[in-house]
From Swiss-Prot:
One of its GO terms (molecular function) is hydrolase activity, hydrolyzing O-glycosyl compounds. This is 1,4-alpha-glucan branching enzyme GlgB. Pathway: Glycan biosynthesis; glycogen biosynthesis. Catalyzes the formation of the alpha-1,6-glucosidic linkages in glycogen by scission of a 1,4-alpha-linked oligosaccharide from growing alpha-1,4-glucan chains and the subsequent attachment of the oligosaccharide to the alpha-1,6 position. It comes from Burkholderia lata (strain ATCC 17760 / DSM 23089 / LMG 22485 / NCIMB 9086 / R18194 / 383).
Amino acid sequence: MTDTLFERSDIDALLAGRHPDPFACLGPHGQTGQVVVRAVLPGAKSVHALSPEGAELGTLACVDRAGCFAGTIPRNGGAPHYLLAIDWPDARQVIDDAYAFGTLLDDAVLARFSAGDPAAVLDCLGATPARIDDTDGVRFAVWAPNAQRVSVVGDFNGWDGRRHPMRLRRPSGVWELFVPGIGAGECYKYELRAADGRVLPHKSDPCARATEAPPRTASVVADVAALDAFAWHDEGWMHARPRADRYRVPWSIYEVHAESWQRVPEEMNRSATWDELAERLIPYVQGMGFTHVEFMPIAEYPFGGSWGYQPVAQFAPSARFGPVDGFARFVDRAHAAGIGVLVDWVPAHFPDDPHGLAQFDGTALYEHADPREGLHPDWHTCVFNVGRTEVGAFLAASALAWARRYHVDGIRVDAVASMLYRDYSRAEGEWVPNVHGGRENLESVAFLRMLNDTLHGAAAPAGVVTVAEESTAWPGVTAPTGDGGLGFDFKWNMGWMHDTLAYVREDPVHRRYHHDRMTFGLVYAFSERFVLPLSHDEVVHGKGSLVAKMPGDAWQRLATLRAYFGFMWAHPGKKLLFMGSEFAQWAEFAHDATPHWDLLDAPAHRGVQRLVRDLNRTYAAEPALHALDCHAAGFSWLIGDDRDNSVFAFARRDEAGHLVVAICNFTPVPRASYRVGLPAPGQWRELMNTDAAPYGGTNAGNDGAVWAEAVPAHGEAWSALLRLPPLATLWLRPA
């Protein structure tokens, strides 16, 4: 009898975790006048079928001591609704049968996924609490086209891959299963058997919306409905965002490593939670006059020393900072304070942690199979195969999810240069040319265009900004995709950063020989739309902090940094400054330590902080300093060739004719009567002086104002004699 209820071949295949189609034998299967019910429940003592009201419908006999059960129940017309009453050694469990449910995902959404629609990834993959046929549970779906078998495992089944093998939906390669009786908060992973028969290490869900806190590695079922129904209060912000001309408004970005911005030393040096960061970071950013906060990657990452740049869960805010809805609360409060939120996002590569994406289904699924394409030589990580339709859709869906679910205002795309060149950091013979024999990565170009079109299109909330960290001269990074560009809104100006930092590192007596480093950036300043980045990358790995790069004694170093900040904030391009630099921290960035806030007890460091605050406020208040950041009409040199005195002067303007003139003296020698051409006659007010006493300077200057007289100089009809403070920048504005 039992042989007819449960075929031996099915029993053996299920217990070995090799059955190609568990739904073909498990669950209810009709026979004349009755229904055969089969279940695999290793460790169960007995199993009974009950009606929803609790009446016994039949007993499932143990047909194999390893945990296979089968029995019959009455048909009673249509397909019966039954429950399984499972007697475990220590308790009875009454649940719906996972194998009594039909297919879950619509064929159309699976077709969209296979065609590369990022929105389809959000619609079908991951773990989603659901109610199906009046039964609550979780719908699991994962892409693993080359696996022989996929099971979902978790606390709910003792992490036993025999309990919940999934259904393969051909031809999409997506596996699905509805597990009744569980919900948000459950830990889970996937157990996969590769095509060659290997059982792989348990894998986290690539599309998990939540995770355990490291070093634990399980995915966590998120309350998706609650996240989607989050009570946002930023309607005004979201409505106004696309209506602001992002290129004409001030951008001053405070770059933050969320894990270390303000640790809690009395609690084992833990990171602050999102709610704690909202209480402390948002008022700080607002008070300092920054317009945006940019987080180094916050998608879950196993290794803290990667600073987030080796993520394993592209859709999940790291559990280091508390529940995922805490990040939504942070963004909501930031918007209420008038602060935009950007996140660093990593589509170039991923770590090879065994629970992650590497060899996900036993094959190079997310990465390239050829190590000349699939292994990154600098970071020893796996390179995403963005040319594969489903992988490109997966990544773009991640960016889309941050914009949709968490209202982030933009993403900064990491390591774009490494994606664009097939020979990036590779020697001859270690890379594969493209189809035309060249070094350009055509698949990455297509992916980046698709990404930007997605985030700038109807699928995303209006007004999302994309920023490229691209360190080469690749043309058209910020040009529209329709014109052959990559479609980014802004690009980090790495050349400007390298050149100008190299200049200020020089002893003042030698700066005359490196004068062009400060002026060369204007040759190409308007070829792209730029952000001027003084980022975390410049204050790690032995490079020294910004102030530590400067030569001279402590006073000269601080003065040079102040002068450099004055030059930067007046220079065309949006601004970015890494945490700790705003008060001239001496130490390099350390991910396991907090910035040295105690330095603010010293007047000199408070002065630098006050300067950055005032630079931000003045930059935002003066349209001349930001409205034409991306247009050559907004800039003109007044003095660009006085290398002997290491003096620079230039004018910034907007379309309405507002003017600001910046004059920089990068020597410790005060200039008592230095003539500077000015674009307008009359009184010019001293708008900014980085040598002012409140900033820690000597208070040398021009008593608040100068008069432009009809003496031609530097191509202008008017000029003024100025006192230039040592190692300082002045800003002047017509009174």
